[in-house]
Amino acid sequence: MSRLPIELIEIQFIHACNLSCQGCATFSEIKHSGYSTWQQIETQLEPWLHRLEPESIGLMGGEPFMNPRLEQVIMGIRERLPNTQIRLPTNGLLLLKKYRIVEMLKEIGNVTLKISYHLDDPLINKAIKKIMNDFEFRPVTEYGINRWLADNEFRFQINRPTTFMKSFRDDYADMKPHNNTPTDAFEICVAKRCPFLFEGKLFKCSTAGLTPWILERFDNPNSDLWEPYLNAGLSPDCSDHELEKFLRNFGKPHAICRQCPSKYDQDSLLDHRKLVTKK
């Protein structure tokens, strides 16, 4: 079978973050250590590249600019996938300190640099101003998203989230799934089209991929309640039928979505602006 197109594959390559945002989709508000190298990412990604042709690769944190191997990872992806767009999210706090990476992104092209604007911080505001002054942008709207576009397909985007959705009930030591209908949970999902690669397996989203990992870290609380949501990842040696089924579900509800909140779970819909702090 020829390689199948997929819109996006997100890759978790650092868990640590310099902010603590309650309800973080990748559980990065708690303390983490370590990071992934390009060699480790390539080992996970390569088996899938024999079967899938990603339009975009997203490098997820944590805070990606905290990974000391970020430049090597970016160049590794560009060399292996010269026609694939690289999406790089950041909270912006380290952009000025590591501005050479911003310049590199412009040089290699076909990149989207996205600031998730969590704080009204001078470092972030100065970085935004510098980027806007250093490159000749024109405003564009792509897939309903407002961005700035420069030559060499360099895109710059700023998101200003106001609500974070906590993907589980109670605290980490007593995590419980929401057990909603897939349709109700998917209705407010912010990761509707974000397949996620973690530990070699492909998941519907970061929550599906990282929940078993974070449960294990906290000694698997309420394991009986979580049983339906475990082992949800697709292995690269899956059958053609399994892979095609996964791709057909792209952008649609799935049984795994039941673990997440719906609009009726107001305790899990957090005012992000009041619940973000620097670490």
Report the location of each language-model feature.
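Soluble or luminal CAZymes and related metallo-dependent hydrolases
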Residues: P5, S36-Q40, R69, L123, ...
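Conserved AdoMet/S-adenosylmethionine-binding subsite of the radical SAM
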Residues: N67-E199, K204-A208, W213
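Accessory C-terminal segments flanking Radical SAM cores
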Residues: R169-K279
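Conserved alpha-helical substructure of the radical SAM core
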Residues: M1-T90, L95-R100
